[in-house]
A protein has these predicted regions:
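Mature extracytoplasmic/periplasmic domains
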Residues: 307-370
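Periplasmic solute-binding protein
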Residues: 131-139, 161-191, 219-220, 304-310
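Early extracytoplasmic/lumenal segment of secretory-pathway proteins
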Residues: 67-133, 393
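Ligand-binding pocket segment of bilobal, Venus flytrap-like solute-binding proteins
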Residues: 210, 214-217, 221-295
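Short beta-strand->loop
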Residues: 74-77, 163-168, 180-182, 188, ...
Length: 393
């Protein structure tokens, strides 16, 4: 069992000295046995004994607080299943999870503002571009964990630092898919990302802002596959094929396809899965009118983005933080983590149990790209410059 913390031992030494003082006071007063001195001695002894009692309680409380095991989590995930996931970690380890919820941008701004005073131990973000930015800004602490390295494929985690430490790990994956109007579009005309920039699809495409991290990640992947020159020409073609200026989120694009505002849209797979799992009549109507393509099955495969985790740069509970990430990569936790947002598990050998995802893929495996997700982030500055040049808002 670990011994008491230094502050508790300091209290004990002070208490011993105070107790000795209590015994000395009467001896000093004996030569002068006036009532005044006796009353003063009595009051002083009572004060010291009262202080000793209070100090003893503080020492005990300090020891208890020092021994409490916690991990402080800043999370951009806000799903109903997460509470059960974190409770499972506490039950398995005895480590309490203190959680702060915010969006990715808010979390990163808070970490920068807090600096070394930040209480954060673990950071969960929901996009590869944001994880890369957090690493580049020095917000994460590279770690070495055999359990995480064995569980998470190399292409779904940060590149190793010089000492072999890894700044972040993917914990779930989502596909950037193409949705189309079944009544108006032939699947063969949208089965690759490249065809989004083909003149045959002029005036048909809906998409959210090009500068949104989900699109930046896709465009970074296309740049990795095609090279900068071809990627920029492709982006120019996509802009020429827009049915309307970019606006809204991914769900808005799917609904626009069903409503006939456009014929083709780009979305993360989980937005479509939510609609497919919904019991609302309006969502069932949308789902009946659209179909989905997992692009580039005959070439490099569908672009996969991630939600991932990292240990905070100034974590005060580093061992607990690593344990928490290792837990999230375990087979049991992986399905909880992934199903919370209709995603696929990132860990090797863990099979999704999500019915909407199985329906989306026809129950068959699909080819996903294998480029390092860290390479996507490395292209972000160049991609943003391309978007500015081609007028992709």
């Amino acid at each position: 069992m670990p011994g008491p913390p230094r502050n508790a031992m300091g209290w004990r030494r002070s208490l011993s000295r105070m107790i000795r003082v209590c015994h000395i006071i009467p001896a000093l007063s004996e030569p002068s046995s006036t009532d005044y001195l006796e009353r003063e001695n009595h009051r002083m002894r009572n004060r010291i004994l009262s202080f000793i009692a209070s100090a003893s309680l503080l020492a005990v409380a300090g020891t208890a607080l020092a021994q409490e095991q916690v991990v402080n989590l800043y999370s951009a995930r806000h799903y109903a299943t997460d509470e059960a996931l974190y409770s499972g970690f506490t039950q398995a380890t005895g480590i309490k999870v203190n959680r702060v919820d915010a969006d990715d941008a808010g979390i990163m701004a808070r970490l920068k503002a807090e600096g070394s005073a930040s209480p954060a131990d673990v950071i969960l973000l929901v996009d590869a571009a944001r994880l890369y930015r957090g690493e580049a800004d020095g917000l994460f602490l590279p770690i070495k964990s055999k359990a995480l390295e064995d569980a998470i494929p190399a292409n779904l985690r940060a590149r190793p630092a010089a000492d072999g430490g890894i700044a972040w790990f993917g914990l779930s994956t989502r596909a950037r898919v193409i949705v189309y109007n079944k009544a108006k579009v032939n699947k063969d005309d949208v089965d690759t990302y490249e065809e989004l920039g083909d003149p045959k699809n002029k005036g048909k495409i809906c998409i959210r802002s090009g500068s949104h991290p989900y699109n930046l990640s896709l465009f970074g992947a296309v740049t990795e596959h095609l090279g900068e020159q071809k990627a920029e020409a492709w982006l120019k073609g996509v802009v020429a094929n827009l049915a309307r200026p970019p606006k809204g989120g991914d769900t808005d694009q799917i609904r626009a396809v069903a409503a006939g505002e456009c014929d083709i849209a780009v979305t993360n797979s989980y937005y479509l899965a939510r609609i497919m799992r919904s019991d609302k009549p309006e969502d069932k109507d949308v789902a009946s009118k659209v179909a989905v393509v997992f692009p580039n099955q005959q070439s490099w495969g569908t672009h996969m983005n991630i939600a991932g985790g990292a240990v905070a740069r100034y974590s005060k509970n580093q061992a607990n933080a690593v344990k928490f990430l290792e837990y999230l990569a375990s087979p049991t936790a992986q399905n909880y983590f992934a199903n919370g947002n209709n995603e696929w598990p990132a860990a090797k050998g863990v099979v999704s149990e999500n019915p909407a995802l199985r329906a989306m893929t026809g129950g068959q495996p699909f080819k996903s790209e294998t480029i390092p997700i860290s390479a996507v982030g490395e292209h972000m500055p160049k991609v943003q410059q391309m978007l500015d040049r081609v007028g992709f808002k």
